[in-house]
Amino acid sequence: YPLRRQRQMCIRDSNKLMDELAKDKKRIVVLNKSDLADKVELTKWEDYYKNRGDVCVLTNANKSENISKLVNEIRKQGKEIYEKKYSSKNIKVKPIYRCLIAGIPNVGKSTIINKIANRNAAVTSNKPGVTRKNQWIRVGSDIELLDTPGILMPRLDENNAGVKLALTGNVKLEVVDNEELACSGINLLINEGYKKLLVDSYSIEEELLDELDSYDILEVIGRKRGCLVSGGNVDMSRAANVLLDDIKNGKIGNIVLEKVEM
């Protein structure tokens, strides 16, 4: 049965693909990197999945938060499958709970596997595209986890999905223009109700955010952070990288860029 791992800051992008993948299967939805998420919006997502009938576990794999809870859920769901399959046949078998780990790139799938296995069984990195092939990993005597490369929908043009994935580090920044992405990020933060994070993080007057366009706001951010070249001009590419790093690593504050549709 699949364990679906998606970052809270951009959740919906591969839902259709995951739903098809997990069709007629037991599913545990793991919302990893929960420490980076807007707690109010994260709770809405947790309720959304629970209302759909999915088991939902919030984790912060880097700090091993709720990993034991996740393992307990794997065994609980697996036991239900085995009892349903074998109890009526009066067959006694030693259960092996096999889980497919699926999700978009760079959401911590391999890190969670390593925490569950309590060893470095899967290669990890804070950038997408590191896991290249499927790999079965044994945990104890009763759990087998299949680590898989990240999955993305073929089309990412709906609801700024591609921009959101790039902002949260789920696609490689090398394939996008960093200044354009940073400007899109500024617009998203403002439109999604996170204007105050820009004010607090970069000491920008709120009135300026209303008056300036995103490129000019990025220039202000660059000046505030000392991204200057000779002549006192702002190095816009460097300013963009500062903002993108702050968003990706949660330095700007806790955010969710994909909201639950009520």
Tell me what each language-model feature is.
Residues 61, 113, 143-146:
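Conserved active-site beta-strand-loop modules that form the wall/rim of enzyme catalytic pockets
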Residues 12-28, 34, 40, 54-55, ...:
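Helix-rich effector regions associated with P-loop NTPase G domains
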Residues 1-11:
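Single conserved hydrophobic/aromatic residue that forms the stacking wall/gate
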Residues 98-118, 148:
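Glycine-rich phosphate-binding P-loop
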Residues 12, 80-88, 122-126:
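Active-site phosphate-binding and catalytic loops of NTP-dependent enzymes
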Residues 6, 48, 69-73, 115, ...:
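Alpha-helical scaffold elements adjacent to nucleotide-binding pockets in ATP/GTP-utilizing enzyme cores
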Residues 37-102:
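Canonical P-loop GTPase G-domain recognition
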Residues 94-96, 119, 134:
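Short coil/loop residues immediately preceding or within conserved phosphate-binding loops
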